[in-house]
Amino acid sequence: MYSTRGELDGKSLYRIHQKGTEGEYRESYYYVLEAKLVLHPKIIVSFQTEFVENEDRKEMEKQDCERKACWRLMEKIAEAFPRLPICLCGDSLYACEGFFERCREMGWRYILRYKEGSIPYIAGEYRALKGKEGNYQERVLEDGKEWYDYVEDIDYNGYHVNLVEYGSYRKRVYKKGKRKGETEEERKGFWFATDFPVGRKNVANLVQRGRMRWKIENEGFNTQKKQGYHLEHQYSKDYQAMKNHYYLTQIGHMVAQVMEAWEKLWSQNRQSREQRHQRVLESFKKVRLKENREEIGRRIQIRLELE
């Protein structure tokens, strides 16, 4: 969320950059950990939030702070949705014994982006065994190829982890712009840690599900930051008001995604995006809420005082 080199309130986190140099400076910022639900390729909605607050006023240690926030968030989700089958997609930060333990206790599954530095032992076992397992498979594409490999049942302190490797090689041809007609080689490679059983028939599907994390990042947070929602703007100096605005942003983005997913229906009306959103806004004004009817119906007066 919002960050600045200036001062924020006591709830904010901070980091010292370029320590011990002339360019040393302090960055203060607000941080939130968000659980998003993938309902549809075009609909990714927020369904639980955990604001990370600096209770002891120490410099933030990303790994420690974010993991602790994740444990609190998982407890919230389990309490609110005790019977909901859940598969968590996340980055390599969560590849640790504490995460595996909580998933086992809650009966949840996981597909995590994995990097060698997360748990080096798992990477070492994978490299030692993958050539012996014979699970490598390759598929030829029109513009290149992609391949999969995996090793099942790597024992890490009693937790059985399956590691999946995905790689691709493609030739990209520029069709527009200054580089039109030029060819560029593109190589990608990712590892995923999961507790789902892995086989030749489902390995591609598991990789696709694991890559949902990027969809959440790109179509969720990046959309809110860069496409009109201005999530990183400080809308208020009051911490609670800022949190309220964040929640409203999540609701607004959810409504917008549902609208855009109904593209075929809206195309018949031939209206711009702004016009469609305005129509939805007007429809909200006509809805009578069942909750707190007495408070809504009570006459009030708002007086503004100029200083």
Stretch-by-stretch model annotation:
Residues R200-Y235:
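Short amphipathic alpha-helical "interface-anchor" segments enriched in bulky aromatics
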Residues G23-E27, K180-E184, Q234-Y246:
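Structural motif
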Residues D56-R172:
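An internal, acidic/charged active-site-proximal segment
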Residues M1-R5, A35, C70, L88-A95, ...:
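Short, conserved catalytic/metal-binding motifs centered on acidic residues
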Residues R187-K188, A193-G199, T223:
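Active-site rim beta-loop-alpha module in soluble metabolic enzymes
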Residues Y30-V32, K42-I44, R83-P85, G107:
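A general structural motif
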